[in-house]
Amino acid sequence: MSQNTPSLRELEHHSAFVERHIGPNDAEIAQMLGVIGHASLDAMTDAIVPAKIKSPAPLALPESITEVQALAKIRAIADKNTVLRSFIGQGYYGTHTPNVILRNILENPAWYTAYTPYQAEISQGRMEALINFQTLCADLTGMEIANASLLDEATAAAEAMTLAKRSAKSKSDTFFVHDAVHPQTLELLRTRAEPMGIVLRVGTPAEALEADSFGLLLQYPDTFGQVGDYKALVDAVHARGGLVAVATDLLALTLLAAPGEWGADIVVGNSQRFGVPFGFGGPHAAFMACRDAYKRSMPGRLIGVSIDAQGNPAYRLTLQTREQHIRREKATSNICTAQVLLAVMASMYAVYHGPEGLTRIARRTHRLASILAAALRKAGVQVGGDFFDTLHVTGVHAEEIHAKARAAGYNLRAIDSDSVGISLDETTTRADIVAVASVFGASLDVDALDASTADALPAGLLRQSEFLTHPVFNTHHSEHELLRYLRSLADKDLAMDRTMIPLGSCTMKLNATAEMIPVTWPEFSQIHPLVPADQALGYKELIDSLEAMLVECTGYDAVSLQPNSGAQGEYAGLLAIRAYHRSRGEDHRDICLIPDSAHGTNPASAQMCGMKVVVTKTDANGNVDVEDIRLNAEKYSDRLAAIMMTYPSTHGVFEEEVVEICEIIHKHGGQVYTDGANMNALVGVAKPGKWGSDVSHLNLHKTFCIPHGGGGPGVGPCAVKEHLAPFLPGKLGDHGPVGMVSAASFGSASILPISWMYIAMMGTEGLRKATQVAQLNANYIAKRLAPHFKTLYTGRNGLVAHECILDVRPLEKTSGIGAEDVAKRLIDFGFHAPTLSFPVAGTLMVEPTESESLHELDRFIDAMIQIREEITAIEDGRLDREDNPLKNAPHTATAVTASEWTHAYPRELAAFPLPSLKLQKYWPPVARVDNVYGDKNVMCACIPVDAYKDDEVEA
């Protein structure tokens, strides 16, 4: 072979995906390194990362493989799962995902690559979809307001418990729980209640009548299918100053009286059966709806209606001062990431079917259940009454029934030795009920029983009220109409399919198509979370493999994949620390040190674990103040439980003293929690578990490529050292020292293939290179923008980690232009803004990630330089201080094409500040949204159609 002939191994090109994932090619990397003054990526990394923490050896992971190879490997894993028809219920039900929704939302990067809608003007499409979701939930539950999703039904029930505690007049510490709630809900309530000093009492509705409690949780219909009349009980709880929360089923509420109509104060549930597959437990969009009086205490994000600068209706995140990143240690919930993508799917399922279609599905499901119940009773089998879709069958040999059912291709619910549950759903057919009946030795003539069998719902609890009367739920019922509606919404937004999203602390990197493909395979999507273990062997292999990958990347010893958001991972880590101290007889350790530069969820999570937060200082360079930590560690030595720190810091720097900080905390008996939000600066370079940290949460929706989905889903694994491993979250049915933190034992399991695929395709060298290029891209931006915007904090050698904070505050003094004006002006250039005023007010935090090409980085830099020139023009008097393109940004097509233009600058500067924008231009659908108006006039449901009508034209 001649020297110029490549080897077969080179031609096989196993690292092809690495080159697809990383934006700049090697020649561009060399060019960028020249700009920042380093000869190689390794030399740059040596200059950025403290020597004390650098990993001495490469990651012990396989080499990179191609997309084709990775898909073949994960196909072999998926094939080890066994897909039966699951009639297990317990909060999870079969559903048909309409193909138009599957292809155009779940599989569409315009929807799944978007970020949380903090920038309202470029998020109008998904916020309209979320308003639809809120309207759906509020209408069906009979409540006045609903939020834009929560993580799962059990978490939502726990949030309802704490909302009731905050809001009830009763001073009791007892929360009464219906003994027929779903088991996973009860498990999670136990986890949440104990650290907060809440006493749980579990019992029957009759016992609840006499109980002194601040709140009551009912399940309606209950976990065994029973539909009860709770009006008298609700009145009794209210008379004692308590609040009533109800966990419910949205499909059932198309037929049953809404909880709000019989007195409920808070209603929670899961929208999963509105078109979202089982997915072995998630992700699914839960919800909370409540009385208007409690809206300012409600957890989760809330979409509201405001007006824009032209007075037109516009959506925005409303009442944001409720949220954990603002309230910090005063927060009562740490909800951050929720389940926006799944909420959008559920809302569009309702839009597509409309109220009549939903009612038809519910009636069909109930009719099939009624016919099956009649057949079983006719054969002498005992079946409970007053049900919607779930039959509680008693007096049978359960083990024998389950064996026969599985042989016939069905899973039924395991309850105890002499009873089983059967939950029917949208997917159930005539053939299914015939087959299930035969398992019990019953035969049936479907049509004959249909004609002779009455419905099984109590007449006094049938729904009389209308729901989903807004035109959006009564218009888009043909596929063409829904397809075009979805396209119109997507076109209003900026997602990663159109532009870089340089949000600091958010890691908006490529979500590769190959990574996404396995998510919708039936072998992953159609597995109920409670199937027998031998039907989920593929999931076990996937989970074990991914946990081992994450252990290697982090240097910890064990990982739990149960937490279904970063905030839940934080909570799990702190629960592990708390349980560890208690296991050693040190229950008194309750102080958590948190630097003031920490992630906003940190103090909220600590508070939820019953810890008291002590905030420590940062120095003038943005570093954690080691001496202040030392002083506080000594001051609270006997009570010190933990420190929570983000590394690299939220200020975008690698702090030199991280090892010393760990030693200080350990000396005083505490544990070190390292927030993994910025792990994208560490993978393959340094491992927190090796420099003294005891626990971290990771964000698979940041570092490991699960898409953000417009505000969820996410996965927040909790990684720990060996001594904390016994205190990771328990699984359903376990009785260990720590309970569940999510409804499903493995959280949002169906999206785990995404991260597995990413790690497999990148390999050990690719993962390290991704980290290095993420650092390079951030430093390239900081260096090129240095003559125009100061980078607020830098680390050793004047370099940043993987993100940089641009300081706009000095310019506000000279020009009147603030960070928000810059953020809004970037929209005119087709960019999503960087993170605004976090972690430092008046700044912009930029994180480009490794996936952005040199072309895209330069496009962003050119936009920022042009904005700086406009600010200079204001400073020089060439542009008016009040009437300028920054103060009036963003500019809509309607505004710049209006017959009258009254501004003191030309239309072309407003619309096309750079020539390149004439070739490709994003037009925001609304002008700047009025935040103050939105918070003063809270409206969180679909906008009435007449609000969009133009004023009548005078004749």
Curated annotation (Swiss-Prot):
Keywords: Oxidoreductase, Pyridoxal phosphate
GO molecular function, one term: pyridoxal phosphate binding
UniProt GO cellular component terms: cytosol; glycine cleavage complex
Catalytic activity: N(6)-[(R)-lipoyl]-L-lysyl-[glycine-cleavage complex H protein] + glycine + H(+) = N(6)-[(R)-S(8)-aminomethyldihydrolipoyl]-L-lysyl-[glycine-cleavage complex H protein] + CO2
InterPro entries in UniProt: GcvP, GDC-P_C, GDC-P_N, GDC_P, PyrdxlP-dep_Trfase, PyrdxlP-dep_Trfase_major, PyrdxlP-dep_Trfase_small
Domain of life: Bacteria
Role this protein plays: The glycine cleavage system catalyzes the degradation of glycine. The P protein binds the alpha-amino group of glycine through its pyridoxal phosphate cofactor; CO(2) is released and the remaining methylamine moiety is then transferred to the lipoamide cofactor of the H protein.
Family: Belongs to the GcvP family.
Protein name per the record: Glycine dehydrogenase (decarboxylating)
Source organism per UniProt: Stenotrophomonas maltophilia (strain R551-3)
The gene coding this protein: gcvP
